[in-house]
Amino acid sequence: MRKLGIPTVVDRTLQQAITQQLVPIYEPLFAEGSYGYHPNRSAKDAILKVKEYAEQGYTFAVVLDLSKYFDTLNHEILINLLRKNVKDERVVQLIKRYLKSGVMVNGVVIDTEEGSPQGGNLSPLLANVYLNEFDQEFLKRGVPCIRYADDIVLLAKSRRASERLLESSTKYLEERLKLTVNREKSRTVSVFAIRNFKFLGFALGRNGKGIYARVHPKSWKKFKSRLKELSSRKRCQSIKPSLEKIKVYARGWLNYYGIASMKNNIDEINGWLYHRIRMCIWKQWKKPRTKYKNLVKLGIPEHYAATIANSRRKYWYISNNKAVIWALNKERLINSGFYDLATAYQSVHVNY
């Protein structure tokens, strides 16, 4: 269970003040390969950097999984690291007090002898300060290291080199930084192994045109599952609010994953989602008389509308009927608020 610090308004203000003082000190000191919690850097930049290295021949990855990273930061090590660059001891002591301020677990506040309480402004910065030691060490060794918070990928040009890296990086993290590496989840893998290489929700692929970023299958599954939930017959009792929720979610998802090559996948999900929305509308019409009236109003011949309206077939089947597709075509659904994934993807992806 994740431990959360619940800072008061005063604590939060103080944390923000300390953070504002430390950011100008540490930003120039952080490694180029660190992407999490930095101004003007993102997860998209991180996966594009992995892609860039892969194009240079670094096609084997060491994927490191840290067990409960934020909860297990060693206070003594962190305070000593801070003292290297923070010359005002009062600031260091304030941070020390913050680290030991306690966290809430199952509604009970417990003392903290290790870890950085999540939920405050300061925690992300301290997490980066701690792992910057790791970043700089492997930078000195000439190893490409890409890190987003506690998601770490080291890159090598051969499997053998990656296996040596897994051993040496695990040793450094556990012995020097007193962290726990999850041995079962940490591994060496080809960056093109779609099932095994997953970084920040992305994977890499290659074809005759070169190397490209793609959405990992698990991320696709989660996306489709959420769309299915938002477009369920229960959720869609009122269609316009449901379309708005789908739009907000899908737009955020595409803004994140828009760098990936996924035209065929998006087209497939887009068609499936249109079908789902037609099904919801068909269910909303409920009575055969209402269905008949609406179909005729939308241009379906009366005799055909009567046959469809009185059909006992299931919603999913009828909503894929040619007449229903024509009556509830893309243009009409878009005018009603449908967020066309294919069009949105094209406008986002063109920037990459």
Question: Where are the regions a protein language model picked out?
Answer:
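Conserved phosphate-binding loops in nucleotide/dinucleotide-binding enzymes
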Residues: 2-8, 209, 213
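Extended C-terminal regions of large enzymes
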Residues: 276, 285-352
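A conserved non-catalytic segment of reverse transcriptases
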Residues: 100, 176-244, 249-251
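Duplex nucleic acid-engaging cores and interfaces of nucleic-acid transaction enzymes
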Residues: 9-15, 19, 47, 51, ...
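Residues immediately flanking
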Residues: 20, 64-66, 157-158, 202, ...
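Conserved polymerase palm-domain catalytic core
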Residues: 29-191, 196
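Non-catalytic, peripheral interaction segments enriched in hydrophobic/basic residues
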Residues: 242-288, 292-296
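Electropositive, glycine- and tryptophan-enriched low-complexity nucleic-acid-binding patches
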Residues: 16, 20-33
